[in-house]
Amino acid sequence: VLVRAATTWGGLRACATAYQLLSHAELPSFCRIEDQPRFLWRGLCLDVARHFFPLPTLLQVVEGMALLKMNVLHLHLTDDQAFRFASPGWPALASEQHYSRQQLEQLVAFGSARGIRIVPEIDMPGHVNHWLTAYPEWGLHPVAPTDRFGVHPACLDPTREVVYRALNVLLQDVAEVFPDEYIHLGGDEVSPDWWQQSEAITQFMADNGMASTQDLANYFLQRLVAITQGLGRKPVAWDEVLHPDMPTCLVQNWRGVTTRDQALQLGQDCLVSAPFYLDLNYPADVHYAFDPSADQQSQILLEDQSLEDVRLQHVAQGMAWTRMWREGAVDLVEPLGGASVLGGEACLWSELVDPDTLPTRLWSRLPAVAERLWSSASCRQIDHLYERLEGCWETLSPHPYTHQQQRLAGLGLS
């Protein structure tokens, strides 16, 4: 086997291809493969807040991603239920189950050796119920701890300078552990009612000419981006941060294709995640059909077809929200300022996923997303997708169906 590559990372990806090829029982007598990635950002967002995944599990995830030629593990470290990062500046934030600095540095080094960047997410100003149990002065009033999943209304108070001083310390702690050029700042599912109930906040908005809580959220983002850039990092945030006056920020799209094009029209680079939610029980071919750079009408057609897919009727009601976000659709002629889709991320939210069920949810479909992000737009071999998946599964550890096999064995079945 002869491997030629222009970079170390290219050599790693070529070795992954060779490993997959050599894992098959029947090998061609001769073959030549010329390959390169289509997108720069080929990632997985893993929620470690709702359920905690120990370090050995994360290392297995990185190994599998390397075999799939992916290159970004986005760790959703914080949420309403838990805070998995140990901040020296704010030690009360850390949940009982959290990652030590040594563990995270080990993960970063392990990923780097395999061409996998580790991008941390500290989600704010919403999804901070756990924060406010530790430091109630950052919000409007104390809140009770919760392990119930779903959207909780508690938010940071963006009018208090003490909040920005705290975030400067926290993000500095994050930057010292994670060397990647990006820090994900969250920004999703902010409850306007939480801010509107405060006379002090509504007065602040009036004094500063803010017509809506979206303007207030954008003020918070501007302050947060300034802190992030001051640390020599670039910001990423979920697509709720879209605003005509938003600062430069890599936007992660999750609310349907229209927010992707809104970001591009504002001159913001974009990551696509909307069609790649692995915690939902979609067949792999549904994920595979979506092209991150396809035109808006093609994407909307696929969304509508998914709503009618008989295999998805068990989640059809939940999928209907994709139509709600079309209200802001734009006719994108040319992205502003050369903005582009940098790639995409599959997302695995862990409300109903734990270390035992992770292999099934992750490896059964992530290879399909990985191929979509790596291969050219003309690669549409959907008829043989499941044959390719079966071949890929044999190279992954643990096998996607390990959990089911163990449960069946416990029942005396095979």
Task: For the regions a language model picked out, list residue spans one by one.
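Feature activates predominantly on carbohydrate-active enzymes
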Residues: 1-184, 198, 223, 227, ...
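Residue-level signal for alpha-helical context at structural boundaries
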Residues: 76, 83, 91, 185, ...
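Short, internal active-site loops enriched in acidic
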Residues: 124-126, 188-192, 241-243
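N-terminal leader/propeptide and maturation segments of large enzyme subunits in energy/redox metabolism
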Residues: 188-210
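Residues in intrinsically disordered, low-complexity segments of regulatory proteins
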Residues: 8, 40, 89, 130, ...
